[in-house]
């Protein structure tokens, strides 16, 4: 809706430029406010629990409506890097509370997420692709299941499957043993 509004404003020439300036004045000065001044669309009601949501691996438009609805309904989003997830939330026009969850997160961090998931909606995302694939989120999922907290997913992009699908190799059997290191070892 915001993109359509900007397109309409820009097509009106000089008058449109004044309207854009007025809209910029209404944008929040809060560095964690990733939305324009218009409120989020109402979230679809979903049950409390932990939701594993895949994020795009290169094109921000590659996200399912169900995944967007889960993000919209989230009380808290567990993220690897708030800067990366912030870009996605901005693209979607959402303003949400985020909490870091990564390799260096403590048991106390995990317990804090579970406390919210007992009565609210916690969404776990990775920087790109499906959480828990070469990712520390499995500890959170295991702890949620042990605590009797519902766990669900909105599947989507996976770098492993995307690479396999364009490799030309047979796809009926394959082994994933982790991603190649990003830096050569000395």
Outline where the language-model segments fall.
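Aromatic (phenylalanine/tyrosine) cluster motif
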Residues: 4-6, 26
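Glycine-rich, flexible N-terminal cofactor/catalytic loop recognition
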Residues: 28-104
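Generic beta-sheet signal
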Residues: 49-53, 118-126, 174
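Short, acidic/turn-prone active-site loops that include or flank metal/cofactor-
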Residues: 82-83, 100-107, 157-158, 178-183
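Glycine/small-residue-rich loop that forms an oxyanion/phosphate-binding "nest" at active or ligand-binding sites
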Residues: 111-158
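Class I SAM-dependent methyltransferase SAM-binding "motif I" and its flanking Rossmann-like core
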Residues: 139-186
């Amino acid at each position: 809706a915001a993109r359509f509004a900007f397109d309409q404003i820009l097509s009106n020439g000089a008058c449109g430029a004044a309207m854009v300036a007025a809209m910029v004045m209404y944008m929040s000065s809060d560095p964690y406010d990733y939305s324009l001044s218009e409120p989020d669309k109402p979230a679809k009601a979903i049950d409390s629990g932990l939701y594993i949501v895949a994020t795009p691996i290169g094109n921000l438009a590659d996200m399912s409506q169900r995944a967007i609805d889960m993000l919209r309904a989230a009380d808290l989003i567990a993220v690897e890097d708030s800067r990366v997830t912030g870009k996605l939330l901005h693209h979607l026009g959402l303003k949400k509370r985020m909490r870091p969850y990564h390799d260096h997160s403590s048991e106390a961090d995990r317990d804090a997420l579970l406390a919210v998931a007992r009565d609210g909606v916690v969404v776990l995302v990775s920087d790109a692709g499906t959480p828990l694939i070469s990712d520390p989120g499995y500890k959170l999922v295991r702890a949620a299941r042990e605590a009797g907290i519902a766990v669900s997913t909105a599947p989507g992009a996976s770098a492993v499957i995307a690479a396999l699908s364009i490799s030309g190799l047979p796809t009926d059997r394959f082994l994933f043993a982790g991603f190649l290191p990003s830096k050569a070892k000395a």
